[in-house]
Amino acid sequence: MSAKVWLVGAGPGDPELLTLKAVRALHAADVVLIDDLVNPRVLEHCPDARVITVGKRGGCRSTPQDFIHRLMLAMRAKANAWCDLRAATPCIFGRGGEEALWLRERGVEVELVNGITAGLAGATNCDIPLTLRGVSRGVTLVTAHTQDDSSLNWRALAEGGTTLVVYMGVAKLEEIRQQLLEGAMAADTPVAMIENASLPQQRECRSTLAHMHTDAQVFALKSPAILVIGSVAGAGQAASITVSASA
């Protein structure tokens, strides 16, 4: 019988944010493929499984995706059940959708298991509500790192009026700043830059759109980091949020 595959989100880093469904999948797995950004402590839930590291880290040397695909197919004949364990959640900038499609086209049974995304975990740890009545009625999740290195339409995002949560944006802070300002986003819009979201070494740099690039340099912001851009990013700072009846 063919192996069952779980594509599992390991959460943003804090092992206590692992879901119960993810824990059950790890308990059942014979083999676990683990991403570079996954906290090794989650492997306590699969002590007898064979663990294979398949590093995927933006801006660094990574395991090629086609190699991961071939490895997945090879595991089909060698394991009864296995997990591909990814940081955060596999279906938000985690290749979970394309991996599930690739496996299903080859007759492999696949189950996707969501995790808590880093944008939500990091914001929550900094007491930032991504939506807030009278302030922000929506959230837009975007990645600044694309496969073809094309740029997002930041000007359109500036006009959207939602909280922006930007993944993989550290290397493009100046481009993001310029494009949002050109899209008429206010220069004093609050920005929170959150490094190592949910981990004990989490760091937080509060700034504004106009100054976020220079402040990040002084702060020595490093990846992995999340950017939260919008009025809600002023949460926790006295008199920093203005509530509007129309929001």
UniProtKB/Swiss-Prot annotation:
UniProt-listed InterPro entries: 4pyrrol_Mease (IPR000878), 4pyrrol_Methylase_sf (IPR035996), 4pyrrole_Mease_sub1 (IPR014777), 4pyrrole_Mease_sub2 (IPR014776), CobA/CysG_C (IPR006366), Siro_Cobalamin_biosynth (IPR050161), Uropor_MeTrfase_CS (IPR003043)
PROSITE patterns noted in UniProt: SUMT_1, SUMT_2
Keyword Cell wall biogenesis/degradation: no
GO-annotated molecular function: uroporphyrin-III C-methyltransferase activity
Swiss-Prot/TrEMBL catalytic activity: uroporphyrinogen III + 2 S-adenosyl-L-methionine = precorrin-2 + 2 S-adenosyl-L-homocysteine + H(+)
Enzyme superclass (EC): transferase
Keywords for the protein's UniProt record, in alphabetical order: Cobalamin biosynthesis, Methyltransferase, Porphyrin biosynthesis, S-adenosyl-L-methionine, Transferase
E.C. number(s) listed in UniProt: 2.1.1.107
Involved pathway(s): Cofactor biosynthesis; adenosylcobalamin biosynthesis; precorrin-2 from uroporphyrinogen III: step 1/1; Porphyrin-containing compound metabolism; siroheme biosynthesis; precorrin-2 from uroporphyrinogen III: step 1/1
Lineage top rank: taxon: Bacteria
Binding site for S-adenosyl-L-homocysteine: P12, T117, A118, M168, A197, A225
Pfam families tied to this protein: TP_methylase
Gene Ontology biological-process entries: cobalamin biosynthetic process; methylation; siroheme biosynthetic process
Family: Belongs to the precorrin methyltransferase family.
Role this protein plays: It is a step in the biosynthesis of both cobalamin (vitamin B12) and siroheme.
Protein name: Uroporphyrinogen-III C-methyltransferase
Organism: Pseudomonas fluorescens
